[in-house]
Amino acid sequence: MHENERYAAGLQVRRAVLGNAHVDRSLAARTPFTEEFQEFITRTAWGTVWTREGLPRHTRSLLTLAMMVARGHDEEFKLHVRAARNNGVSADEIKEVLLQAAIYCGVPAANHAFALAAPILAEQAAEGGANAAD
């Protein structure tokens, strides 16, 4: 796949997973300093990895949540809680990931992740958003 095609495929997946509003904000916030990085993320993370057929997006979202907990990347974790819901991940599945993380990443990391995820899930349920019925 040509670089431009990979970018276009990545942008499509990035929008589907993260939502148009987030992607539009990220692209609008580009500067000459960050523009190449935004293109790199879209082309490589989204256009190369997230477009692969080896794992469904649902599974990729679960893995991403676990890795964000393990690395302590709070803002990305919150972003990917929303993204996981866009990929059909239920609140119960997110809870299971966090319980698993408690064992392998430590109780404090999981406790913090529960505190970050809870308001997002509650907000989505109140708005009738992604998978609100679970």
Sequence positions of predicted segments:
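Acidic, glycine/proline-rich low-complexity segments that act as flexible tails and inter-domain linkers
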Residues: M1-H58, N86, H112-D134
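Gly/Ser/Thr-rich helix-start
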Residues: N20, T48, M67, H73, ...
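Short alpha-helical scaffolding segments that buttress acidic/His motifs in well-ordered protein cores
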Residues: I41-A45, L62-M67, V97-A102, A113
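Mid-chain, well-packed structural core segment of small domains
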Residues: L62-L65, V69-K95
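Substrate/cofactor-recognition hotspot
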Residues: E76, Q100, V107-P108
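Short, amphipathic alpha-helical segments
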Residues: G88-A91, Y104-N111, A115
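Short Asp/Glu-rich motifs
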Residues: I103-Y104, L121
